[in-house]
Design a protein with these regions (language model features):
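Active-site phosphate-binding and catalytic loops of NTP-dependent enzymes
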Residues: 104-107
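Blade-loop segments of beta-propeller domains
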Residues: 60, 64-68
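Major-groove recognition helix of helix-turn-helix-like DNA-binding domains
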Residues: 67-84
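Single, function-defining residue in the core of a domain
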Residues: 1-52, 56, 84, 91-95, ...
Length: 382
């Protein structure tokens, strides 16, 4: 079934990406395709080391012809991960993302508005500073940071950036280009009035939590619906030092009572027309990106690495994102109703099973007829 899964990556298209990134420059014998299949096997087969990747593939040597590879020596795979550009894997991810959007009827989100809705967040991936001395974050701690955009149509990642742990969320947020009318949901780590002013001038909406020490003046008070747990709905202008120059636009401050946690949440947005309860629901839906990070770390190999160089770590993270995209694509295509953890576990057990992959995806527990007569084995104990 692994070979059928790899048909999501046409070889001709893959080779074009190899040429674009010059991934096989000075390469001898070990192809970029073999490297990619090996690293994808690391994720889907849950291999913990180069030895397990090499040994796991070697134990299936007779079945690797269908994959177009041979089992690589661990030293060869380790060298390729250290020296071949990680940008190839980023390009594979973006290409697969387009294919997923084109081939799957994405499940519509619960909101009626037509604006594109994305969540923006980041997550630390801790590293041992003694082994990864390039990943300085704090004096005794190493880390890289995965910044992610999650599209709420289908809850697929739409873009990702991997940076050093020291890089701020706001710095990365400035790199993203959003289409006008897009609604960006983020947390207080992205509170930057210069960024909010930039987005507002470009016609991009944001929904976030307001800082407790924000200074503002109320321009207008809107009517509130207490039944929807809305306590206040105010049109405001920032009046703190420098804030009014960075973001001179009218904003909206909404106080919402969360009866589940019995706390008051204060939202800040530049969308002046949506209902206050809708703004609160939009922010609540941001938990999807936190769930994505949790699933990524729990089900794929992203907390321990098979290489120690920055290039090898990035290749493994991008491969994990590719694997996650495959799994979400399979969930959306399947009629079975897989949970992610069950899909990961059963797929790992059946990677080299001879069966129609898409039939298995819809009916994983179907008992197939045995196509030939079997003879009972007998032991001569005399």
């Amino acid at each position: 079934m692994f070979s059928q899964l790899l048909q999501l990556f046409p070889r001709s298209e893959f080779q074009m990406m190899v040429k674009e990134t010059r991934s096989e420059r000075h390469a001898r014998g070990f192809s970029s395709w073999s490297q990619f299949v090996s690293m994808l096997f690391c994720q889907l087969g849950h291999a913990f080391s180069l030895r397990e990747i090499s040994g796991g593939l070697r134990s299936c040597e007779g079945k690797l012809k269908h994959l177009g590879i041979s089992a690589p020596p661990r030293s060869t795979l380790g060298y390729a991960n250290e020296h071949r550009p990680w940008e190839l894997y980023q390009l594979i991810f973006l290409t697969l993302l387009d294919r997923c959007h084109n081939q799957v009827n994405l499940k519509k989100r619960k909101f009626r508005f037509k604006n594109p809705l994305v969540s923006l967040d980041s997550s630390f991936i801790d590293l041992c500073l003694e082994m990864y001395n390039w990943a300085h974050y704090r004096r005794t701690k190493g880390a890289v940071k995965l910044h992610l955009l999650l599209d709420h149509d289908g809850y697929l990642p739409s873009f990702a950036v991997i940076t050093d742990g020291k890089v701020s969320d706001v710095e990365v947020a400035r790199r993203f280009k959003f289409a006008p009318d897009t609604i960006v949901v983020d947390d207080r780590g992205y509170n930057d009035y210069d960024l909010f002013g930039k987005w507002t001038s470009e016609g991009v909406y944001f929904v976030t939590r307001m800082k407790d020490n924000a200074v503002y003046k109320v321009v207008k008070k809107n009517a509130v619906n207490a039944k929807r747990h809305i306590l206040k709905d105010e049109i405001i202008k920032l009046s703190g030092p420098g804030a009014s120059e960075k973001c001179p636009y009218q904003l909206r401050r909404i106080e919402f009572y969360n009866d589940e946690k019995q706390e008051i949440l204060v939202f800040l947005t530049n969308h002046l027309k949506l209902a206050a309860s809708t703004i609160a629901a939009i922010y609540k839906d941001r938990w999807r990106i936190e769930t994505f990070f949790r699933d990524l770390k729990q089900n794929l190999k992203i907390k321990t690495f098979v290489g120690t160089s920055a290039n090898a770590v990035k290749i493994q993270i991008w491969t994990a994102l590719i694997a996650m995209l495959i799994l979400r694509f399979l969930q959306l295509r399947s009629k079975f109703g897989w949970s992610l953890s069950n899909l990961v576990a059963l797929l790992r057990m059946n990677l080299f099973t001879h069966r129609d992959f898409w039939a298995w995806l819809d009916q994983p527990f179907e008992v197939l007829p045995i196509p030939y007569d079997t003879e009972q084995l007998q032991f001569d104990l005399s």
